[in-house]
Amino acid sequence: TFEYDGWFGHKALPEFARSRTDLAAPVREYVFDITRRWMDPDGDGDPADGIDGWRLDVAYCVPHGFWRKWRRLVKSINPEAYLTAEIVNRADEYLKGDEFDAVMNYMWLYPTLNFFAPNVKAPSVREFRRCQNELLKAYPEEALYVLQNLLDSHDVGRIASMLENVREPIAEFQKYFEFSRVHGRPEFVTTRPGPAAYQALRQ
């Protein structure tokens, strides 16, 4: 039997062969072929019949060198294509104009959740603004207009549930992800969120 290294230990998801800077050539070309198929299905050079963008899951698990080559391919097919990536921490390295146009902006989410969650000792308005301004300065201006500023996602609890249940500040994805897993958390309120959570949403 074959035994593969699995992505994050998931044996059903074998890891691609790669170097420090790129995916192995056969894997890279396979992904490139998929990209061409979806962006220009009939291969006539007109992308009007193809998709207009990509959202890449766990993009931080793939080398930067691959994303740079992939971006060049995508933009050669459709210069207007939108490329966004799941990056759960600071994304400066991905938003230099040679990889992605935008990211899922979890770094915006953490201070926002902490500020509005009724059961968390909220940071001051000054601290909240400092966190947001730090991000505004870190990313290129053109990226700021297309970032995905999200309050929840398919990977974590919905915002009303998080507002109801969060009791301490959250500043990084692993803690946020683990917190939203109900199993083993008898204190996690799984019924309809109470009025305090909805009041926070209305703010």
How would you describe each model-predicted region?
Residues I34, P47-L150, V166:
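Active-site-proximal helices and loops of the catalytic beta/alpha 8
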Residues E15-R18, A102, Y106, Y110, ...:
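Generic structural "secondary-structure junction" signal
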Residues T1-P47, W70, S76, E93, ...:
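Substrate-binding/active-site clefts of carbohydrate-active enzymes
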Residues T1, A81, R192-A196:
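Intrinsic structural disorder
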Residues F32-R36, H64-W67, A197-R202:
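Short, hydrophobic/amphipathic alpha-helical packing segments
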Residues N133-Q203:
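Active-site-proximal substrate-binding groove within the catalytic cores of carbohydrate-active enzymes
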Residues G9-E29, I51-V62, L113-V125, I159, ...:
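The substrate-binding groove and active-site-proximal loops of carbohydrate-active enzymes
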Residues G43, A59, V88, D155, ...:
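Flexible loop residues that form catalytic
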